């Protein structure tokens, strides 16, 4: 770095980082286009709760982040500190919120113009890549997601 350049460091809490990711995705043209003209599927997860809150506000759709998760590992000290999970992913098709639906209900209808947001729960720092550790013995939500993403070229983003 030359003497005329400067750098700044910022400390973000986990919550602040999630809101930053959420605001960026809620402003992304491809994400908004999928929600308004095609199908946007946001899989339940703690980061995606912030993403959906920002998207729902932008799209004037109802949403409560409380319980927007499937598996939540809090450790023994906080085991009872979370709310019961919701029963549906956040799915918007052509601007309309599909209530009480999950990725399992819509995966077969997804195509190239559609978009899935599935939170990452693992990082490989050396390669700077995100990943998903699958806890279900039958593949969980990743199975229908992979069928859509690999088989029908549905776009997949790991916020």
Where are these regions (language model features)?
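Anion (oxyanion) recognition and catalysis
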Residues: 146-150
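Ligand-binding beta-strand-loop-alpha-helix segment within the catalytic cores
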Residues: 2-4, 15-27, 57-140
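Glycine-rich beta-strand-to-loop/alpha-helix junction loops that act as flexible
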Residues: 42-47
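Active-site rim beta-loop-alpha module in soluble metabolic enzymes
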Residues: 159
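Short helix-loop-beta connector
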Residues: 32-37
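Phosphate- and divalent-cation-binding pockets in alpha/beta enzyme and binding domains
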Residues: 50-51
């Amino acid at each position: 770095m030359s003497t005329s350049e400067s750098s700044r460091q910022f400390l973000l809490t986990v919550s602040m980082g999630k809101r930053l990711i959420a605001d960026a995705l809620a402003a992304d043209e491809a994400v908004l286009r999928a929600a308004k003209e095609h199908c946007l599927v946001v899989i339940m997860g703690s980061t995606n709760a912030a993403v959906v809150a920002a998207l729902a506000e932008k799209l004037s759709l109802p949403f409560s982040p409380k319980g927007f998760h499937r598996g939540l590992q809090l450790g023994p000290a906080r085991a009872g500190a979370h709310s019961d999970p919701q029963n549906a992913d956040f799915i918007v098709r052509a601007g309309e919120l599909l209530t009480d639906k999950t990725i399992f209900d819509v995966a077969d209808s997804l195509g190239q113009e559609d978009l899935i947001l599935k939170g990452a729960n693992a990082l490989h720092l050396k390669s700077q890549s995100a990943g998903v550790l699958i806890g279900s013995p039958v593949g969980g939500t990743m199975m229908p997601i992979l069928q859509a993403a690999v088989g029908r070229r549905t776009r997949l983003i790991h916020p």
